[in-house]
Amino acid sequence: MVRRRHDGRGSDDRPTVRGGARVNIALVLLGGMLGAPVRYLIDRAVTARIDSPLPLGTLTVNIVGSAVLGGLIGASANGWLLTAAGTGFCGALTTFSTFGYETIRLVTDGAYGYALGNVVISVAASVGAVYAAVSLTNWVTP
């Protein structure tokens, strides 16, 4: 059973936006409505331009989304911005499920090296993008 807290924080100790759950849901929806089509457009643009056995469209959106989230965290974005842009936009832009599916598809196609490469590159590049963006925004912002 999850207990409700009344101190302005969510059940996982993250600050919530003033106005409660309805405002948070609206912010996530707004961010998601922007992130999902951006994901689709980036994926299609990359896939149309580069022919590769690696799923470079998914890799690109995951790296970009990780960098955006890292920038928000590094800049100490406020609650509403982190909810809309971090959870909503970046959540819709990035895609772990497609990453998993495409990796399994590579395995079932017998492309084991590409599958391993996809996992290593995706994780390393996404974590690296977060780290770089946090570092950059910490350096740029006082």
UniProtKB/Swiss-Prot annotation:
InterPro entries: FluC (IPR003691). The chain crosses the membrane at residues 23-43, 54-74, 79-99, 116-136. It comes from the Bacteria. The keyword GTP-binding does not apply. It catalyses: fluoride(in) = fluoride(out). One of its GO terms (biological process) is cellular detoxification of fluoride. Belongs to the fluoride channel Fluc/FEX (TC 1.A.43) family. It comes from Nocardia farcinica (strain IFM 10152). Fluoride-specific ion channel. Important for reducing fluoride concentration in the cell, thus reducing its toxicity. It is found in: Cell membrane. Pfam families: CRCB. Na(+) is not transported, but it plays an essential structural role and its presence is essential for fluoride channel function. It is a multi-pass membrane protein. The keyword Glycoprotein does not apply. One of its GO terms (cellular component) is plasma membrane. Na(+) binds at residues 91, 94. Keywords: Cell membrane, Ion channel, Ion transport, Membrane, Metal-binding, Sodium, Transmembrane, Transmembrane helix, Transport. PANTHER family: FLUORIDE EXPORT PROTEIN 1-RELATED. This is Fluoride-specific ion channel FluC 1. One of its GO terms (molecular function) is fluoride channel activity.
